[in-house]
Design a protein with these regions (language model features):
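Bacterial Sec-dependent N-terminal signal peptides
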Residues: 1-27
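Charge-biased low-complexity segments
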Residues: 20-179
Length: 179
């Protein structure tokens, strides 16, 4: 009886340890099934996680016709038309990507999601995630982030304003706690 109890305890403990795996301790590249993700860990322990094919996130946001760097003002230059559907869809995509146990694990903490939006089409071209490497999001497997990226690219689009159409891309970010 003691042996059975011991093995049950060990199996539960092993499951607990597995669930707490930190995937993003150091800078590294993840070669997955058909995609490559890069995990950059700064000295501040901030993780930047993105598809290795991303290019825009490393390009200065600028005006197409002049090449002049774009700077957002304190008043806020409107680059995208606001609509309730797009907001609800992107929030829903993030919520759906996390399992119930993952949502419980990250409860009370927000994930920062950054997108580069095509200024001509309004489609999402690139997605990036930011979180602390000692926080709860560091225990979420790469497949969850990949699901968010592909769904945002596939299911979300915006309508750029006339000012937004002048840029090489539109930078957009938000913080969200999965519900």
């Amino acid at each position: 009886m003691k042996t059975i109890f011991f093995f049950i305890c060990i199996s539960l403990y092993t499951t607990y340890i597995y669930a707490q795996t930190n995937y993003y301790v150091v800078t590294k590249t993840f070669n997955e099934n058909g995609y490559i993700y890069q995990c950059d860990v700064a000295a501040s322990k901030t993780v930047t996680l993105y598809n290795k094919s991303n290019k825009l996130l490393f390009t200065t946001q600028s005006y197409k016709n002049t090449g002049e760097t774009f700077s957002q003002t304190d008043e806020g230059i409107v680059l995208l038309q606001y609509d309730v559907w797009t907001r609800a869809e992107r929030l829903s995509i993030v919520n759906a990507a996390f399992s119930a146990s993952e949502k419980q694990r990250v409860k009370g903490h927000e994930l920062i999601i950054t997108m580069c939006i095509n200024s001509d089409t309004g489609k999402v071209d690139e997605v990036e995630f930011s979180f602390m490497n000692f926080g709860t999001y560091a225990t979420i497997p790469i497949s969850v982030y990949r699901k968010i990226e592909t769904d945002l690219k596939e299911k979300v689009w915006y309508i750029p304003t006339e000012e937004g159409k002048k840029l090489n891309y539109i930078y957009y970010w938000w913080a969200q706690e999965p519900q």
